[in-house]
Structures are given as C-alpha cells and as structure tokens.
C-alpha cells in the first residue's frame, strides 16, 4: 500500500469522523435549544402559578375580612334588637303610667275617704316603674332643669320670676327613655325669665 492510498484512506476516515461529530454536535445543540425552550415554558408556567397563588391568597384574605365584618354587623344587629325589642311594648305602657300620675295628682292623700286609693295607686305606680326600670325604661322629669330640645317638647313659654330664662318651670307630661334612647319627650312649660322692667332715665 502506498503512502498516498494510506493518506487518502485516513482522509476518508477523518471526514467520516468529522461528519459524525458535526452531526452529533448539531443534535446536541438542537436538544439544548429544545431544553432551553422547555425551561422557559416551565419558568413561565411557574410564574403564572405563583401569580395565581398570590391572587387566591388575596381573595382569601378579603373573604375572611368580609366574613369578620358580617359577623360584627350581625352581632351589633342582635344586640340592638335585644336592647330595643321592648320599645313597642314600653310605648304601650306609657299611657298607663300617665294615668297613674294623673290619678295621684287628682287625689288628696290627706282625705281619709280616698287615702287608701291614693296609697294603692302610688304603690302600683312604684312597682310598675321598678319593673320597667329593670328593662331600661326610665322617666324624664326635667322640673327646674335647662330646656333641652333633644329630650323636651315645649308646650309654651311664660314669664317667671322664680325660674331663669329657658328653664323648665312645669312638667305637663313626663318623658321616657329606653336604654338611653328617647321613647317620648317630656312635655314642658318653659320660663321666659322675670318680667321685663322698664328703665326710666330722666335727663
């Protein structure tokens, strides 16, 4: 075998090996490119999944806050309903209390013929006031106090030397409140103060 034929044979082997290596390299590059695309896809899917988790976490926090608000409102509504459930019933009792007050005012406790009736009505009135006070009903009797339009209803005004201006001088009908909430204002006569005095100035 001549040197030339050996060299030609070696060149052929070298070309085959190079061709095989370049095919393997191309195949590896192709696989790496596909792997990189797949990694990018997976990273994007992971980022999307994490974003969804954050979104769901935010939704859960909002839902929990909403549930707390609903619970709080429901508890307040129940408390308010319990506190003021007696309002209608208490309003129905007010005329009874007024009639007892009138009966006491119209009866002379010193008169022997009506003394027993007076004492009976007085005891009944005290018992009823004690019973309704247990449920938060309290009378408003502003005699001698400053006029308060939030709790008093002025029937009229009169001059008075005894009471300063804008003072309740007479309670026509007591007012009542239920758990510090006004059931009925007290009907009152309000003082205008003392009669106005004319001042004579002689020059």
Swiss-Prot record:
GO terms for biological process: protein folding. Residues 1-10 have a biased composition (Basic and acidic residues). One of its GO terms (cellular component) is cytosol. Gene3D superfamilies: 3.90.20.20, Head domain of nucleotide exchange factor GrpE. It comes from the Bacteria. It is found in: Cytoplasm. Keywords: Chaperone, Cytoplasm, Stress response. GO terms for molecular function: adenyl-nucleotide exchange factor activity; protein homodimerization activity; protein-folding chaperone binding; unfolded protein binding. Its main location: cytoplasm. Residues 1-20 are annotated as: Disordered. SUPFAM superfamilies: Coiled-coil domain of nucleotide exchange factor GrpE, Head domain of nucleotide exchange factor GrpE. InterPro entries: GrpE, GrpE_coiled_coil, GrpE_head. NCBIfam families: PRK14139.1 (NF010737), PRK14140.1 (NF010738), PRK14150.1 (NF010748). PANTHER family: GRPE PROTEIN (PTHR21237), GRPE PROTEIN HOMOLOG, MITOCHONDRIAL (PTHR21237:SF23). Participates actively in the response to hyperosmotic and heat shock by preventing the aggregation of stress-denatured proteins, in association with DnaK and GrpE. It is the nucleotide exchange factor for DnaK and may function as a thermosensor. Unfolded proteins bind initially to DnaJ; upon interaction with the DnaJ-bound protein, DnaK hydrolyzes its bound ATP, resulting in the formation of a stable complex. GrpE releases ADP from DnaK; ATP binding to DnaK triggers the release of the substrate protein, thus completing the reaction cycle. Homodimer. Belongs to the GrpE family. This is Protein GrpE.
């Amino acid at each position: 075998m001549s040197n030339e034929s050996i060299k030609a044979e070696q060149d052929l082997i070298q070309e085959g090996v190079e061709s095989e290596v370049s095919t393997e390299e191309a195949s590896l590059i192709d696989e790496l490119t596909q792997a990189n695309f797949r990694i990018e896809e997976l990273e994007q899917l992971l980022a999307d999944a994490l974003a969804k988790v954050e979104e769901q976490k935010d939704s859960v926090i909002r839902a929990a806050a909403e549930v707390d608000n609903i619970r709080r409102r429901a508890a307040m509504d129940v408390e308010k309903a319990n506190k003021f459930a007696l309002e209608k019933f208490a309003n129905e009792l007010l005329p009874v209390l007024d009639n007892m007050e009138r009966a006491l005012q119209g009866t002379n406790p010193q008169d022997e013929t009506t003394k027993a009736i007076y004492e009976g009505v007085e005891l009944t009135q005290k018992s009823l006031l004690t019973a309704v006070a247990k449920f938060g009903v309290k009378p408003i009797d502003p005699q001698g106090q400053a006029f308060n339009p939030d709790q008093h209803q002025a029937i009229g005004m009169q001059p008075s030397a005894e009471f300063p201006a804008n003072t309740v001088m007479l309670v026509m009908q007591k007012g009542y409140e239920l758990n510090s909430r006004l059931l009925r204002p007290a009907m009152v006569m309000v003082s205008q103060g003392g009669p106005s005095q004319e001042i004579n100035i002689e020059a």
